[in-house]
């Protein structure tokens, strides 16, 4: 990984820098490129605009690593309110959640309780919940909670990160369950004993994992793959592979991040593919912004120029 990205991922955990950035105008300007707003109303408006372009969405109230049960329950209540707004507004969106935001660091039982409240409410209104994957320490707890919930609910899916060595085994397990799987490259700073350090190796593993998900075994079990990438080469591979395998466009979807490559998003929908946009919102945008800056250094240079010109 480039040094710049490693540094930004480390800084994403700095509370002092967070407090500075959330009040720094240029940082807020850049954040609005990647975040649909700070309020629920702004988020719903953004998703309505996506719907007009035939784009689906997965809304996420930003936040992670809460430190109290009260914070975890407040985050759960916010997501339940979000679901009500989705139903009332009739927007084409599910929700994404992070288990550390629901209290996983405090107690797996607390996170499981809060997650089930969200999934149960989503099932009532016919919506889907995606459990985001966080850093390596949370992979197994996340999969454990997902599997426990999968026994009772089918409107829930999970995320697999291609840069982790263990992901092939995890995908095999999820195929046996017939789960919905979002496949991403991975955005956390992981050591080389658990993750591929080179982008080329991650990309190669991404294709291997996608082949697993698109395999006859995967199709037979009911797996629904979500190919989550902005990498044109991987998108072209997925289009070619599914065409050659006779997999119709309604048996998988592409997923991208809000504000990134909107022209490509529209091109894919025009070609008949399902495209879902991960759409984050809320005042806790700082860690998310730092991860996006790590992926796009040009935005970092703009931010630094603005800071030193104050």
Which positions does each model-derived feature cover?
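Positively charged, amphipathic and often flexible ligand-engagement surfaces
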Residues: 1-310
